[in-house]
């Protein structure tokens, strides 16, 4: 499948995978890509498959000359689902913001190398973390 930008989807998936353990291929559809980061374990006592994590997820949409994004912070529960949940611990929020910024920088650099822009979605008004200079 070729995206509106003219780039083959399979090649983009390969490049996105090289950015780190963020892309969830099974949740990518058509010209949309899904990334997430399990940044902070809520409680290490349960068995690994039962653990919950604080983290973020990002949806990326391919358009002709750019990719647009929207992201959320929240909880990745033991069923493997993301839920928007307020996070009250400063250290956790700082870690999530750091990992999101790091990923955003790598993603932006990759897209620039392909002569594509990375911008917030037109309807994404809730940008709590400053990602671009």
Swiss-Prot record:
Induction: Induced at late exponential and stationary phases, and at low temperatures.
Lineage: Bacteria, Pseudomonadati, Pseudomonadota, Gammaproteobacteria, Enterobacterales
Keyword Transcription: yes
Source organism per UniProt: Salmonella typhimurium (strain LT2 / SGSC1412 / ATCC 700720)
Keywords: Activator, Coiled coil, Cytoplasm, Transcription, Transcription regulation
GO cellular component terms attached to this protein's record: cytoplasm
Cellular compartments annotated: Cytoplasm
Pfam families per the UniProt record, alphabetical: Crl
Known role: Binds to the sigma-S subunit of RNA polymerase, activating expression of sigma-S-regulated genes, such as the csgBAC operon encoding the subunits of curli proteins, and BcsA, involved in cellulose biosynthesis.
Name the UniProt record assigns to this protein: Sigma factor-binding protein Crl
Encoding gene, per UniProt annotation: crl
Highest taxon, organism lineage: Bacteria
GO biological process, one term: positive regulation of DNA-templated transcription
Family indicated by similarity: Belongs to the Crl family.
Residue span of region Essential for activity: 99-122
Keyword Transcription on entry: yes
Gene3D superfamilies assigned: Sigma factor-binding protein Crl monomer
Entry coiled-coil feature ranges: 90-111
């Amino acid at each position: 499948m070729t995206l509106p930008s003219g780039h083959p989807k399979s090649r983009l998936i390969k490049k996105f995978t090289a950015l780190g353990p963020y892309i969830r291929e099974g949740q990518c559809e058509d010209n949309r890509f899904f990334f997430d980061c399990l940044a902070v374990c809520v409680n290490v006592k349960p068995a690994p498959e039962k653990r919950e994590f604080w983290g973020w997820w990002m949806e990326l949409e391919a358009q002709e000359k750019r990719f647009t994004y929207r992201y959320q912070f929240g909880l990745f529960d033991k069923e493997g689902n993301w839920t928007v949940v307020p996070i009250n611990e400063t250290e956790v929020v700082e870690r999530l913001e750091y990992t999101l910024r790091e990923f955003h920088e790598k993603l932006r650099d990759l897209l620039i190398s392909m002569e594509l822009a990375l911008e917030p979605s037109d309807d994404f008004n809730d940008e709590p973390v400053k990602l671009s200079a």
